[in-house]
């Protein structure tokens, strides 16, 4: 409770706060409650993608619902975490596969892309995050075609960025 009050005071006074607390002490709720009650834009940066997903999928909705505050929440990851329609299509037609797993994984990614709204590869647990096929079906800053891309309008990265711009709370990782 003391941590939540200190965080609320720091937010209200536009101040800074450095705080430390042990595992299982409720740090997440201690900062979420005052942040959501304060209104305005909030960016939460986590140290891991697992914690980022936990905040987005579980903790934030729980706190938002308990407080009954109408805040929108967006998840924003680096571009290598999203399937690229253009590179997926290229992999399907021109891909070089070193193993049968690559071919099997490509099929699963293709099906997933047809069903997902986000294109976030963490939503497809059937394909390991370190599977080599991901390098063929995601983009980098260097190989992204941007507005020249024939799949530009369906781009999962741009969709995630647009949702983040419109959201009250954005969950990122560093």
Language model region names:
Residues 1-19:
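Conserved pre-motif I regulatory segment
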Residues 8-9, 28-41, 58-62:
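Walker A/P-loop NTP-binding motif
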Residues 168-174:
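Extended, Lys/Arg-enriched charged tracts that mediate electrostatic binding to polyanionic substrates
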């Amino acid at each position: 409770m003391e941590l939540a009050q200190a965080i609320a005071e720091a937010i209200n006074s536009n101040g800074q706060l450095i705080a430390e607390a042990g595992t299982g002490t409720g740090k997440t709720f201690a900062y979420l409650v005052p942040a959501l009650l304060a209104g305005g834009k909030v960016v939460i940066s986590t140290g891991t993608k697992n914690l980022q997903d936990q905040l987005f999928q579980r903790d934030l909705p729980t706190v938002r619902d308990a407080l009954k505050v109408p805040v929108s929440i967006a998840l924003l990851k680096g571009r290598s975490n999203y399937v690229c329609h253009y590179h997926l299509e290229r992999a399907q037609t021109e891909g070089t596969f070193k193993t049968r797993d690559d071919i099997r994984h490509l099929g699963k990614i293709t099906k997933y892309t047809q069903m997902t709204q986000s294109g976030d590869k963490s939503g497809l647990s059937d394909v390991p995050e370190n599977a080599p096929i991901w390098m063929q079906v995601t983009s980098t800053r260097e190989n992204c075609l941007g507005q020249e891309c024939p799949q530009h309008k369906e781009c999962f990265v741009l969709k995630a960025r647009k949702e983040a711009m419109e959201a009250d709370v954005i969950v990122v990782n560093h």
